[in-house]
């Protein structure tokens, strides 16, 4: 990609360098971020491969024409998949299991969704055939891991790895993964009965997502239900209950509904496509998300209301996520505003951080974050495709 805009072209080249350095050429794993601080006071201990981050990163690699690296990653993912079809939280680059505190069901859905996305770009049927055993096991697990009362995926941690519950974003990822699996089965000429069963499950899940997460009185989606709240501080919810969890009378915070505004709710539309960007349910949700999560002065968007991780700064990937959504909504001016905010948030070495300090406006915490660079490439690719990349 060459745009003729120096800042953009330089950041694109830096992103290619980051992708190369964060890819294990022997195993195919994709590193979330390097560890640069032995005392862990300025970094987040991110030197692992997460299926979630990697699915977004692989999508960006495809935009860069790096198909071999993408296929190497998905081959790695197939090798580390559990026998029951699930994927654990995170791994070392050699495929060994890293320290974990719970299943994050969106990762499995994201990996299967990403496999189909790669095929849609490359049309590599051999790749699809190699992935079929992994896809079949993965989708079968996703269709089993169900809360029969809600119809949603059973309890798992959210994409921020903080709260155990049933989440809108995670449910959307699972739905997209199941639908992708059904399409892969059809493309390979596998059992039409199996593909049909999966599509029926995805259709029921779509209904459950709307039934559980749409709040007509608020005219927007909520992020989670049946949530065990994290123990790091007071949570902001109107429906909090205390539950005794053992005979020693230890109790924990739970909430029946978590209406906290969270940028991940955009995932219902981008990238997972359950709702069109101009669907009224999405536009009303997105409008309040962007309004309430914007950080005054510094700009950019926070992850969610009341976020207190590293002080609650705006994140690069969240702001670029909103850019992707606005491109689909054809609000290119807003998308460019978010895009250029991220471009101007690089370090002196041209690297994108995880966050921008809300007080100083300087790059903060993990540097570089591979997911941030991936989102930059994804937004750049879509703006160029739309012919809407203008010099700011």
Please give the residue ranges for each predicted region.
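Long, well-ordered core segments of solenoidal/helical folds
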Residues: 16-26, 65-88, 131-152, 199-219, ...
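Extended ligand-binding clefts on enzyme/binding-domain cores
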Residues: 7, 11, 167-172, 196-317
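Inter-helical turn/loop segments and adjacent helix faces that build the functional surface
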Residues: 118-129, 153, 180-200, 275
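C-terminal capping/lid segments that line or modulate ligand- or cofactor-binding pockets
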Residues: 46, 57, 99-121, 233-247, ...
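Acidic/polar, glycine-enriched structural segments that form the non-catalytic walls/loops
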Residues: 1-45, 125-126, 391
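Acidic/His metal-coordination segments adjacent to aromatic residues that form catalytic metal sites
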Residues: 36-43, 87-103, 148-166, 243-250, ...
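Aromatic-rich carbohydrate-recognition surfaces in CAZymes
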Residues: 46-148, 171-178, 372-383
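Alpha-helix capping and helix-loop boundary segments enriched in small/acidic/polar residues
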Residues: 45-48, 98-106, 122, 126-133, ...
């Amino acid at each position: 990609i060459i745009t003729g805009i120096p800042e953009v072209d330089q950041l694109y080249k830096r992103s290619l360098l980051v992708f190369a350095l964060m890819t294990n050429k022997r195993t195919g794993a994709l590193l979330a971020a390097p560890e640069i601080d032995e005392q862990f006071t300025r970094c987040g201990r991110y030197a692992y491969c997460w299926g979630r981050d990697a699915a977004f990163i692989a999508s960006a690699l495809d935009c860069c024409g790096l198909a071999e690296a993408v296929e190497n990653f998905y081959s790695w993912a197939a090798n580390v998949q559990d026998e029951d079809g699930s994927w654990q939280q995170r791994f070392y680059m050699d495929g060994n299991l890293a320290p974990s505190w719970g299943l994050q069901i969106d990762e499995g859905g994201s990996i299967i969704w990403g496999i189909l996305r790669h095929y849609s770009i490359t049309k590599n049927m051999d790749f699809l055939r190699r992935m079929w055993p992994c896809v079949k096991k993965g989708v079968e697990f996703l269709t089993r891991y169900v809360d029969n009362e809600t119809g949603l995926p059973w309890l798992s941690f959210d994409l921020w790895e903080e709260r155990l519950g049933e989440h809108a974003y995670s449910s959307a990822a699972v739905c997209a993964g199941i639908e992708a699996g059904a399409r892969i089965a059809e493309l390979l000429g596998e059992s039409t009965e199996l593909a049909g069963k999966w599509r029926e499950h995805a259709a029921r899940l779509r209904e459950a997502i709307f039934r559980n997460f749409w709040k007509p009185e608020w005219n927007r989606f909520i992020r989670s239900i049946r949530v065990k709240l994290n123990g790091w501080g007071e949570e902001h919810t109107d429906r909090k209950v205390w539950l005794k969890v053992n005979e020693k009378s230890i109790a924990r915070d739970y909430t029946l509904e978590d209406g906290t505004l969270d940028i991940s709710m955009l995932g219902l539309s981008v990238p997972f496509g359950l709702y069109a960007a101009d669907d009224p349910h999405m536009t009303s949700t997105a409008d309040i998300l962007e309004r309430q999560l914007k950080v005054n002065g510094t700009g950019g968007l926070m992850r969610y209301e009341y976020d207190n991780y590293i002080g609650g700064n705006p994140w690069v990937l969240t702001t670029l996520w909103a850019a992707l959504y606005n491109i689909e909504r054809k609000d290119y001016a807003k998308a460019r505003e978010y895009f250029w905010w991220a471009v101007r948030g690089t370090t002196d070495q041209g690297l994108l951080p995880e966050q921008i300090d809300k007080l100083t406006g300087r790059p903060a915490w993990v540097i570089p974050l591979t997911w941030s660079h991936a989102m930059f490439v994804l937004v750049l690719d879509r703006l160029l495709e739309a012919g809407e990349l203008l010099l700011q």
